[in-house]
């Protein structure tokens, strides 16, 4: 699916080689992982240091689902930035629903992608999977206990299937940070996991 990004890679190559001076615009939308700004700012800074003229705009909302961005005004805001790449980072909040439904999640992603493609028909879309999360349970009146959210892995599979079915590139952050066995533990040990 990375071939979908070839036009974007070519723009980066031309910029890096000095054959282009056009600013490359990346818009990254998503949930609290984007709202927290650590990931998008680090990514944007590294890209700018490497390639030069990069505009990296993050639009993160705590508690966001992919449907949070299916409002016409939000799609217009994204389109007004004239992006060369749109990155979609969702899945954490969808998977926190104890009645998580793969079919519903698939349909919601489809609605967002259709709206983006209607407004930005030639812009490649890159989907990232969530990094893993914990479920919180009340053990007693004053104590809570936490366990790894088992629905994250299901949401990741749904997202990968959707991306494959619909021609989106995917960066599987869930697997990159440790997958079902280690994603949460690795993030927690690195002090990258924060409470919402």
Which ranges hold each PLM region?
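Residue-level recognition of beta-strand->loop/alpha-helix junctions
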Residues: 58-60, 129, 172-175
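Conserved SGNH/GDSL esterase-like catalytic core that processes O-acyl groups on lipids
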Residues: 23-123, 134-136
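Alpha/beta-hydrolase-fold catalytic nucleophile elbow
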Residues: 89, 128-129
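Surface-exposed alpha-helical segments enriched in charged/polar residues
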Residues: 13, 114, 118, 157-161
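Membrane/wall-proximal cationic-aromatic binding patches
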Residues: 1-28, 70-74
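Catalytic His-Asp segment of secreted/periplasmic serine-dependent ester chemistry enzymes
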Residues: 133-196
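Proline-centered loop/turn at the N-terminus of a beta-strand
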Residues: 123-126, 169
């Amino acid at each position: 699916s990375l071939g979908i990004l070839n036009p974007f890679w070519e723009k980066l190559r031309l910029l890096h080689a000095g054959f282009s001076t056009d600013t490359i615009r990346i818009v990254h939308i998503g949930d609290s992982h984007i709202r927290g700004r650590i990931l998008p700012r680090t990514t944007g800074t590294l890209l700018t240091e490497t390639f030069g003229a990069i505009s990296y705009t993050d639009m993160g909302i705590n508690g966001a689902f992919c449907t949070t961005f299916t409002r016409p005004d939000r799609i217009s805001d994204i389109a007004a930035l004239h992006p060369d790449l749109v990155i979609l980072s969702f899945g954490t909040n969808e998977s926190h629903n104890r009645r998580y439904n793969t079919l519903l999640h698939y349909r919601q992603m489809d609605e967002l992608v259709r709206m983006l493609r209607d407004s930005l028909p030639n812009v490649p879309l890159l989907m990232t999977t969530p990094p893993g999360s914990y479920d919180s349970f009340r053990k007693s009146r004053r104590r809570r206990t936490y366990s790894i959210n088992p629905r994250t892995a299901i949401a990741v599979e749904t997202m990968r299937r959707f991306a494959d079915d619909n021609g989106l590139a995917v960066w599987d952050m869930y697997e990159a940070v440790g997958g079902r066995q280690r994603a949460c533990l690795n993030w927690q040990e690195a002090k990258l996991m924060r409470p919402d």
